Amino acid sequence: MRLLWKLVILLPLINSCAGEGRFSRPIFIQEPQDVIFPLDLSRSEIILTCTANGYPSPHYRWKQNGTDIDFGMTYHYRLDGGSLAISSPRTDQDIGIYQCLATNPVGTILSRKAKLQFAYIEDFETKTRSTVSVREGQGVVLLCGPPPHFGELSYAWTFNDSPLYVQEDKRRFVSQDTGNLYFAKVEPSDVGNYTCFVTNKEAHRSVQGPPTPLVLRTDGVMGEYEPKIEVRFPETIQAAKDSSIKLECFALGNPVPDISWKRLDGSPMPGKIKYSKSQAILEIPKFQQEDEGFYECIAGNLRGRNLAKGQLIFYAPPEWEQKIQNTYLSIYDSLFWECKASGNPNPSYTWLKNGQRLNTEERIQIENGTLIITMLNISDSGIYQCAAENKYQTIYANAELRVLASAPDFSKNPIKKISVVQVGGDISIECKPNAFPKASISWKRGTENLKQSKRVLFLEDGSLKICNVTRADAGSYTCVATNQFGNGKSSGGLVVKERTIITVPPSKMDVTVGESIVLPCQVSHDPTMEVLFVWYFNGDIIDLKKGVAHFERIGGESVGDLMIRNIQLGHSGKYLCTVQTTLERLSAVADIIVRGPPGPPEDVKVEHISSTTSQLSWRPGPDNNSPIQIFTIQTRTPFSVGWQAVATVPEILNGQTYNATVVGLSPWVEYEFRVVAGNNIGIGEPSKPSELLRTKASVPNVAPGNINGGGGSRSELVITWEAIPEELQNGEGFGYIVMFRPVGTTAWMKERVALVESSKFIYRNESIMPLSPFEVKVGVYNNEGEGSLSTVTIVYSGEDEPQLAPRGTSVQSFSASEMEVSWNAIAWNRNTGRVLGYEVLYWTDNSKESMIGKIRVSGNVTTKNITGLRANTIYFASVRAYNTAGTGPSSLPVNVTTKKSPPSQPPANIAWKLSNSKLCLNWEHVKTMENESEVLGYKILYRQNRQSKTHILETNNTSAELLVPFEEDYLIEIRTVSDGGDGSSSEEIRIPKMSSLSSTGVQISKPSTQSLSMVGVFYCFAIHPLSR
């Protein structure tokens, strides 16, 4: 009873401190580590680090060799934060084991143990060392004998005054265990003084011993002898986990012994093992359990062998496998803690509370790594440590035990203010006050105590569960919690909503690629609740906010229909519509099958190929939900334009046919094949092409066409044809066979033309008469044989040039730029040469040969008009006949002088008068220059404004009268006429159409500029009359 009252008094403190969790235990973030300190006067202070977190901040204590350090009694030790500073350290006073303790109101923790040692090495004694005398070929050991020291040493030797260390090899070895220098067999070059150098790495100091002289004895050379092992490793070695182990083995002997190693249990040497150059050192890095066992060193030479062996024993300091964790328990509960650590040897366990060792007593049971405390009370709160220890190390696991005692409290975990449930659903209202020990729970609805029933259940954890909720269950509910320290209560409301129902779910659909569909998803729900629609496709959410292609949500608040536009094959699958409210999640699923053209067939193979056929096989691709009904085979060659459908056997390839023979191929052509599948929906994508293969060769079966020829020189027969394209040549070694014979004979002459590109053959024979007819046919051949021949065609041999010149040649000038040449036709025969036409040559006196004009006319034409000549110039002309062989002799030249140039000045001062449909024109006579032809008359050119047809009126006078209907504007110009041709035209005059009024006009032109200078209206009588 006294304890109960004490707890009541302590409750405020417990709640504000432990219960509220404001205090936190110390946790080390830095612990002291082992230190080997160099004994050097320049180093005046040692720092052993120790830092811990916690609230309030911990204070620190230190132990040396298990005894508390009293910082008030000496300045030698001081606290630096939580770290220990040792000033002017001394070996006799400060060497030992140190531990840091961190304490706050929650408790105390003890750090790992840290060892402080001092590294040093003294000087060698200065006395002279004795001379070592040996025979040549004998083995010898030079002792180093290091001075007193602490810390790891390394050894090296020098020879005479050389600054370089003696290099180790199969004959010489420096032991890093003893420092001694070993010679397996002494040679004359070894004679001299040897000095041992010793370095202490931790003390940062090296010392040098006195020299040891080595001399050779004079009483002979040492004979051969078997190896004697002088450097051997211990029989038993303790090897720590992950450490690097080195075993030394060296032997004296003559000849120099070879060193080798093995494991006595027959296991292979680990691959990680390293050897020194001489094999005298075996190193095992990162030593593990599987590396332990017996190792043997073998030293051998021609005289025998010797052995050394030892055992490596694996050990490991403790490592945690299971640590203890912070635990918060109610008063009178029981504590069970267990910690486990691995190690070799197995560790033992010790338990500590606030840095003090725990022992078994009435309520406390300790067995190996387990701790049990029954009937917990407040005084059991604190920091506990499990220490796992073997002879190599001690490790600590730390945790806090907090024992709690309080009346029920809802401040941190009150009843939910509003709980919402749907009609027909189940609801659980949690009641979890903080109470130590656990409180008993009762419930009220409104002001009435609630009793259990089939629908109303009180759960073990204190929660209230109501099943198959109705509207009448809505209201206020209160949880009342009680323990020996007091009671507490908390209330919340229950709101009941109508259920949500999917009224129109999506249903299974069969659609075709490219269509658009709507999947319905419509619900009825409580009007006070928001509804969220989410669609899934094959398990993945459709994110409509990102504007995913094809998908669109349509509908209002209670409608979540999904539209799929331009549906594709990849849209086949399961569509899940989920409807979410704050209370529940409903879903409905539908399968959508999208049918489309078949996928591309696969694995198209050419099983066999001949000259005109190919056997193919393939595997069907996906039918895309519509059975394949037909296959089509297509081919492509280097000569085709794209892919072409081909004939097959069988002719129709139904959807169950997966092989066929392609027929009608061209021999000796490279083909690719592909297969296309079709179904009710359409034609699918083609397969990948097969490998490129060439059909077998065959005799060519297409004869050349368009057999022709003729021409060429005398005694030549020229034969031409259309070349056969490569795809019809049917094989290698392709060429042409040309066969011909004179008409009326029976024997064929036969020639081969090996050039594939050739389309012409010329046969020469002096006996061939001009224009002799020949029967000609052309065939083809290749390495497989001769193929088809063309039909017979008549081709004439070459002919002679015409032998006769034309007679009766004459020439006449028509204008300043035109003349006409005439001649008599030649009556030709086979002897005088065939005439196909005539060639007219013309030139001037000073024409160069390259400037001679040539014009040809064909057939029996005997005149030729030549234009584009120069005015007032003498031209010469002659005529000659031509045929396919060339041109014949020219006629005698004739000449003519072209007319002078036509007048250069146009008619000027043109006046006009328009009356009804009569137009009166008047202009000045044109005067010509000396080098121009005389004016013989004038041409009047007129046309309606919107028409292209021009009318011409010629006159010898300087006036004219035109009768024209003037429904539209007229355009008029006037030019001169002379022997030299038409002269320059006046500027175009526009005569406007007139409806009722008469009008007159004048155009004044300067002869030099021909520009319009004035337009006016005048009376016709002022310039009259047009007729004389």
UniProtKB/Swiss-Prot annotation:
Classification via CDD domains: FN3, Ig5_Contactin
Domain of life: Eukaryota
Membrane topology: Lipid-anchor; GPI-anchor
Knockout consequences: Mice are viable and fertile, the formation and organization of all nuclei and layers throughout the brains are apparently normal. They are however slow to learn to stay on the rotating rod in the rotorod test during repeated trials, and display dysfunction of equilibrium and vestibular senses in the wire hang and horizontal rod-walking tests.
Disulfide bond positions: C50-C100, C144-C196, C249-C297, C339-C386, C431-C479, C521-C577
Places the protein is found: Cell membrane
Positions annotated as glycosylated: N65, N193, N368, N377, N468, N659, N765, N860, N865, N895, N931, N956, N957
GO cellular component: parallel fiber to Purkinje cell synapse; plasma membrane; presynapse; presynaptic membrane; side of membrane
Prosegment residue ranges: 1000-1028
Record's signal peptide: 1-19
Residues where lipid is bound covalently (GPI-anchor amidated serine): S999
Fibronectin type-III domain boundaries: 600-698, 703-800, 805-901, 902-996
Family matches, as SMART domains: FN3 (SM00060), IG (SM00409), IGc2 (SM00408)
Any one of the GO BP annotations: positive regulation of Notch signaling pathway
Keyword vocabulary terms for this entry: Cell adhesion, Cell membrane, Disulfide bond, Glycoprotein, GPI-anchor, Immunoglobulin domain, Lipoprotein, Membrane, Notch signaling pathway, Phosphoprotein, Repeat, Signal
Keyword Lipoprotein: yes
Positions of modified residues (Phosphotyrosine): Y882
Primary role: Contactins mediate cell surface interactions during nervous system development. Participates in oligodendrocytes generation by acting as a ligand of NOTCH1. Its association with NOTCH1 promotes NOTCH1 activation through the released notch intracellular domain (NICD) and subsequent translocation to the nucleus. Involved in motor coordination.
Family according to the record: Belongs to the immunoglobulin superfamily. Contactin family.
Full protein name: Contactin-6
Source organism of the structure: Mus musculus
